[in-house]
Design a protein with these regions (language model features):
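Bacterial N-terminal signal peptides
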Residues: 12-21
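Bacterial N-terminal signal peptides that target proteins for export
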Residues: 3-13
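Beta-rich carbohydrate-recognition and catalytic domains
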Residues: 27-126, 132-193, 201-259, 267-317, ...
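A short, acidic, amphipathic alpha-helical segment used as a generic capping/interface helix at domain edges
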Residues: 320-326
């Protein structure tokens, strides 16, 4: 027997005395009993050397798709080292920016260049991207600072106003936007006007958007908000509707999560949505947890402890396994991409493992 989606954290549902829509969940459904991770035959480690030099590879925030027989990985690059700033390049192009690399085997990656979007303000960095294929297009949702003219009374400062941008591509490299306006800005009762770490996924006729933000007014605790748009819409600023109006739908509550939940990434397996997420800030020992949902909206922790912790002392990820990006290949095999660092000096690189969901 089907049951309706229950949404406990939005005034909209309470105000009308009903749910927002009927979910596809079934009474009694349960998540898998075990999630197992397997290393690839060769360790995948990727770092971009463009900005810090050959001795300091760096990459964060991975997201991966497969397109025309090739794998595309999108990620964040840090600002240029002072001694490596290119000449005759606008200052804003030396800041944090999104990068692109390609591979044929998920292990060996070649840098293609930076994310560039025709039609969007040139100062948008397209950082911490979420890239998905749907509607016959490749869609990117990423964060940027350029939000001139946006009313944001709860931004901690105009310079740190983070909003989400959207663009599409046919080939995975050249992106276009039909507007010079951001796609989403957080407007709720509990957070700053801040949205980073976008994740989009489909639930019925809705496209769901998860984002990380910080509580108002201190901005010390990172939590997750959720919005939805009609599937097939333009996914612009007029299309998204906040669900987490009164409170976050997910926040740090376990000791290892400390004061931060961020980087949600979602996959559906056998009628269950699994959300992998990062707990604790990057300057701490970030690790990866999992929550699950029967309706794609209300999520419960699958385990109280991290399912993918940082590595042992002396390993490349001894101080972090964080910012997950889930990817399902054409053959159904699921991979978890993630960032890691060996020290607290920010020496981030990217890797991946196979994921097995076991009943």
């Amino acid at each position: 027997m089907g049951m309706k989606t229950k949404i406990f954290w939005t005034r909209a549902a309470v105000a009308v005395g009903a749910v927002l829509w009927t979910g596809t969940a079934t009474a009694g459904v349960r998540p898998c009993s075990n999630i197992r991770f397997e290393q690839l035959p060769r360790l995948m480690l990727y770092g971009d050397t463009t900005r810090l030099g050959p001795d300091r590879p760096f990459a964060k925030d991975p997201t991966v798709i497969r397109h025309n027989g090739k794998y595309f990985m999108y990620y964040s690059e840090c600002s240029y080292a002072k001694d490596r700033v290119p000449k005759n390049v606008p200052k804003f192009r030396t800041w944090w920016w999104g990068g692109i690399a390609t591979s044929t085997n998920l292990v060996d990656w070649t840098r293609v260049g930076n994310i560039a979007v025709e039609g969007a303000p040139e100062t948008v960095g397209w950082v911490a991207p979420c890239v998905k294929k749907f509607d016959g297009k490749i869609h990117i949702f990423a964060q940027g600072h350029d939000a001139k003219g946006i009313d944001a009374p709860k931004a901690n400062s105009p310079k740190s106003l983070n909003v989400l941008w959207h663009a599409t591509s046919d080939d995975g490299i050249h992106f276009k936007s039909d507007t010079d306006k951001p796609a989403f800005i957080a407007r709720n009762e509990w957070s700053l006007n801040r949205a980073i770490d976008a994740e989009v996924y489909r639930v019925g006729d809705r496209m769901m958007l998860m984002y990380a933000t910080r509580e108002h007014p201190t901005g010390k605790i990172q939590q997750l908000g959720m919005a939805w748009a009609k599937y097939g819409s333009a996914y612009g600023i007029a299309d998204w509707h906040e669900l987490s109006i009164q409170a976050p739908f997910f926040k740090p509550e376990r000791p290892w999560e400390m004061k931060c939940i961020e980087a949600p990434t979602v996959i559906q397996r056998k009628g269950i949505w699994y959300m992998f997420y990062a707990g604790a800030y990057n300057h701490e020992r970030q690790q990866i947890g999992v929550a699950w949902s029967a309706d794609g909206v209300n999520f419960t922790r699958w385990r109280d402890e991290p399912v993918f912790p940082h590595g042992p002392e002396g390993s490349w990820n001894a101080w972090e396994s964080g910012h997950p990006g889930i990817f399902e290949d054409d053959d159904g095999q699921v991979y978890l991409f993630y960032q890691g660092k060996a020290t607290l000096k920010g020496d981030y690189r990217l890797s991946c493992v196979k994921v097995r969901f076991e009943d």
